[in-house]
């Protein structure tokens, strides 16, 4: 196994960490070509965000280390919590409730298997 480890980050993605993690579970440990196909046909909105980060990681690997895409595998997909926007939701009798709009972070690490 080679020591080439490529990383790409997607910060402040407009999806909750739970929803991002549902899609991230599909591609953990898979070859990059298979993972791209999984994300292409996944109907979830978070799949688009993770797909963009994965394509960025692939581009980083090709540009910085000139590795072959067929040898790249996903080592880990880290999903975390980012900031939360607080909004006001008007309720009955002049009351108001807070609504939290949660955002998430995704970090994808790739390695080259020879």
UniProtKB/Swiss-Prot annotation:
This is Large ribosomal subunit protein uL22. The keyword Ribosomal protein applies. Part of the 50S ribosomal subunit. InterPro entries: Ribosomal_uL22, Ribosomal_uL22_bac/chlpt-type, Ribosomal_uL22_bac/org-type, Ribosomal_uL22_CS, Ribosomal_uL22_sf. This protein binds specifically to 23S rRNA; its binding is stimulated by other ribosomal proteins, e.g. L4, L17, and L20. It is important during the early stages of 50S assembly. It makes multiple contacts with different domains of the 23S rRNA in the assembled 50S subunit and ribosome. PANTHER family: CHLOROPLAST 50S RIBOSOMAL PROTEIN L22-RELATED, LARGE RIBOSOMAL SUBUNIT PROTEIN UL22M. One of its GO terms (cellular component) is cytosolic large ribosomal subunit. Keywords: Ribonucleoprotein, Ribosomal protein, RNA-binding, rRNA-binding. CDD domains: Ribosomal_L22 (cd00336). GO terms for biological process: translation. It comes from the Bacteria. It comes from Ehrlichia ruminantium (strain Gardel). Transmembrane segments: none annotated. One of its GO terms (molecular function) is structural constituent of ribosome. Gene3D superfamilies: Ribosomal protein L22/L17. The keyword Endoplasmic reticulum does not apply. Disulfide bonds: none annotated. Belongs to the universal ribosomal protein uL22 family.
